[in-house]
Regions:
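Phosphate-binding core of ATP-grasp and ATP-grasp-like enzymes
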Residues: 111-128, 159-170, 195-200
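Short histidine-centered catalytic/ligand-binding loop motif
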Residues: 38-48, 131-154
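A long amphipathic alpha-helix within ATP-dependent nucleotide-binding catalytic cores
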Residues: 142-174
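C-terminal helix-cap and adjacent tail motif
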Residues: 194-237
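Active-site loop/lid in soluble adenylation, ligation, and acyl-transfer enzymes
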Residues: 2-121, 233
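Conserved metal-phosphate-binding beta-hairpin within the catalytic cores
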Residues: 93, 173-192
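A short glycine-rich, hydrophobically flanked beta-strand micro-motif that places a catalytic Asp/Glu
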Residues: 72-77, 166-182
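Short coil-to-beta-strand
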Residues: 24-28, 124-135
């Protein structure tokens, strides 16, 4: 597979075309951002960990019947993926109150929800990624009603699979965000990544944060937290 021109560069990844029009190469960077790009930094080795962790979890989901864009890992930083048209939604599943949910609704961090809650936000940094409901998404023509139903169904399924897996690692999946895309035939698949950049992961016993919140909140030990969560994942695959 030949890597060709750079198609896109985002906050944490670069995307390249290949000699196959239906496949792309994603290259993970060590760059870190928070608060819609207002805070910037570098986390040494993050790109390697995020690439490998995301690939392991995508394969886990595929085995459980959840379609993803993953094709194969090329090297420690690069992965071959199916070309998709990204739907401009961030889909957030929350099992425990934290982050913006606690801030917006005045709920103390750590409160466990009776059932997982799903939020949609419009992917637009200039607008601050505002929250959307189904009606907003339909009005903006972000997706069809059937697509939104499919995304919601996949999101709940993914949450259940990941919660169960992380529990075996002594880790609590607090919340996480996902992106979905359309393949050429219109079918919906999970895209982007699943990593400590996109998930809140707490040690199940101590509630120590093992994710990008350590960078957001200047808690220190960011590289160690990423390495620890990767170590636990590899031990339980």
């Amino acid at each position: 597979m030949e890597k060709k021109e750079q198609l896109y560069e985002g906050k944490a990844k670069k995307v390249f075309t290949t000699d196959d029009p239906d496949l792309l190469i994603v290259s993970y960077k060590d760059d870190a951002t928070a608060f819609n790009g207002l805070k910037k930094g570098t986390i040494a080795g993050k790109g390697i960990i995020n690439n490998q962790m995301s690939n392991h979890l995508m394969m886990l989901l595929e085995k459980q019947g959840v379609p993803t864009h993953f094709v194969k890992e090329l090297n420690e930083r690069e992965t071959l993926v199916k070309k998709v048209r990204i739907i401009p939604l961030e889909v957030i599943v929350r099992n425990i109150a934290a982050g913006s949910f606690s801030k917006h609704y005045g709920v103390e961090e750590g409160v466990v929800f009776d059932k997982p809650t799903i939020e949609f936000s419009y992917k637009n940094d200039a607008l601050g990624d505002p929250l959307l409901n189904f009606h907003h998404a339909l009005a903006l023509k972000v997706a069809t009603y059937r697509e939104l139903q499919t995304i919601e169904r996949y999101a709940m399924r993914i949450n259940g699979i990941l919660q169960e897996f992380w529990a075996t690692c002594g880790v609590t999946l607090v919340d996480f965000k996902m992106e979905f895309g359309r393949l050429a035939d219109g079918s919906i698949v999970l895209a982007d990544e699943i990593s400590p950049d996109t998930c809140r992961l707490w040690d199940s016993d101590t509630h120590e944060k093992l994710d990008k919140d350590r960078f957001r909140r200047d808690l220190g030990g960011v590289e160690d937290a990423y390495a620890e969560i990767m170590r636990r994942l590899e031990e339980h695959l």
